[in-house]
Every structure is written in C-alpha cells, then in structure tokens.
C-alpha cells in the first residue's frame, strides 16, 4: 500500500553554500535535528541534488552517504533520488550494504521529466528486495496536464514496488 499525493508543490530544496562556508556547522545542525526527529518516531531525509538544480552541496548519492555517516543519527537518513543517480550516471551497486540508511525512494528523472522505464529501476528493485527495504517508494515528477502520463507512471511504479 502507498499514499498518492497529486498536485503538491515540490518539497525539495537544493543547497547552495556560499564560497568558504563552514560545513562543520551542518554536522551539528543535522545531528540535533536527526536526533530530535528520531525521538519523535520519524526521520529527516537528506536528498542529494545534482548541479543542474543550481546546487553546490551534497550533489551526489555518495556525498549524501558521507554526510549521513558523519552526522551519525538514526533520525538522519538518505532520501534516495533516482533522478540524481541517472543524471550523475551513478551505479546501483554503490547502495549495496547501505539500504538500511535509506528512508525513502523517489522514482524520478533529471529535470523532473515524466518517468521512463529504465534498467536502473529493476536493478534497484532487486537490491532493495535483497536487503529487505520496507519503506516508501514514490514518484517525483513535474506538473503535467496529461493525466495519461501520470497514470502510466503510477502503473509502472506500482509494478516495480509491488514486487518488493
């Protein structure tokens, strides 16, 4: 089962740090935030965004994992974004042994274009299944006036996630 949100405004904001910013401040901030979230039975999801979104901090999945490891909080996990992985040409193998650090999976495309059927989706599904992932999988896509595009994306992701 899952929840479908239609017509929501984007909730993801890329990070753009000023030149020379003290990144260690982020560690303490995210640690406090993550620990608080965990104490309340939830998590904060760190989603990397590639530079195509005008970001310069946490631009790939590996740097997000590095930050999550440094923050070291059960309430600060990865929001895995397939659009980022596709844009950066990242390999699903990078996730091996770290699926427990994923709080949420976005099936998406670079630029939030309509979802395309891709081999990376079945590779990810196999890894998530193997490592016992049991959390949310959702579609992240830009606005469309063509309901058929949305229906196709939902049917595709349902096939993908029902097999987990």
How would you describe each model-predicted region?
Residues 1-77:
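Active-site acidic/histidine proton-transfer and metal-coordination neighborhood
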Residues 27, 31-32, 39, 58-164:
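Histidine-acidic metal/acid-base catalytic patches
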């Amino acid at each position: 089962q899952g929840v479908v949100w239609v017509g929501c405004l984007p909730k993801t904001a890329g990070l753009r740090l000023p030149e020379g910013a003290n990144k260690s401040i982020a560690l303490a901030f995210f640690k406090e935030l993550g620990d608080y979230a965990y104490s309340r039975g939830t998590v904060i999801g760190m989603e990397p965004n590639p530079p195509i979104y005008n970001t310069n901090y946490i631009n790939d999945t590996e740097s997000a994992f590095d930050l999550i490891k440094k923050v070291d909080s059960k309430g600060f996990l990865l929001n895995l974004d397939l659009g980022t992985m596709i844009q950066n040409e990242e390999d699903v193998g990078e996730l091996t042994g770290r699926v427990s650090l994923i709080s949420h999976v976005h099936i998406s495309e670079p630029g939030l274009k309509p979802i395309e059927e891709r081999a990376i989706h079945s590779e990810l599904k196999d890894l998530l299944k193997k490592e016992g992932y049991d959390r949310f999988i959702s579609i992240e896509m830009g606005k469309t006036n063509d309901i058929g595009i949305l229906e196709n994306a939902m049917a595709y992701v349902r096939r993908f996630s029902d097999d987990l």
